[in-house]
């Protein structure tokens, strides 16, 4: 079971770097967001920490995929291949059916995590795009105010 832990944030207004640290299942996942030089006029703690947290969550999902689900699926497939090569292999046995079920279930888990990673990446991209559009409008209004 995943124990929810409050993320730890760090914001450095001098450098424009935000960091988010998430500890889950004994592993540390870090997300970093660095403000681009051309956006320093719009730099903010909330935006930086939000982006850093989204990146830390992505790191967590990738670790689940790469460190847990993929090795488990590979082990199940290797086991099935090994028993399939045996002279005593019985495709109708309870154990064979359970192993095939575990392979299917783990493959479905892998597909789910891949989908979650894709959705999280899209959410991050959308968030950053919306922020860029907002900043563009604010800059435009500031320019208009200066000329008036």
Q: At which residue positions do the language-model features occur?
A:
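A generic, well-ordered mixed alpha/beta core segment in the N-terminal half of proteins
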Residues: 5-7
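Positively charged, aromatic-enriched nucleic acid-contacting surfaces
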Residues: 9-49, 59
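Intrinsically disordered, low-complexity charged/polar segments
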Residues: 61-105, 109-112, 116
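C-terminal charged interaction modules
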Residues: 93-148
């Amino acid at each position: 079971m995943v124990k929810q832990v409050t993320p730890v944030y760090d914001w450095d207004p001098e450098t424009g770097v935000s960091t988010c640290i998430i500890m889950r299942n004994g592993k540390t996942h870090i997300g970093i967001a660095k403000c681009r030089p051309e956006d320093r006029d719009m730099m903010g703690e909330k935006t930086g920490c939000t982006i850093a947290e989204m990146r830390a969550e992505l790191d967590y999902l990738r670790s689940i995929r790469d460190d847990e689900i993929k090795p488990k699926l590979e082990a199940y497939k290797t086991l099935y291949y090994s028993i399939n090569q045996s002279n005593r292999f019985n495709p109708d046995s309870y154990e064979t059916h359970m192993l095939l079920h575990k392979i299917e279930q783990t493959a479905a888990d892998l597909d789910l995590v891949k989908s979650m990673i894709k959705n999280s990446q899209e959410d991050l991209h959308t968030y950053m795009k919306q922020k860029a559009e907002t900043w563009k409008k604010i800059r435009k209004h500031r320019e208009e105010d200066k000329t008036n």
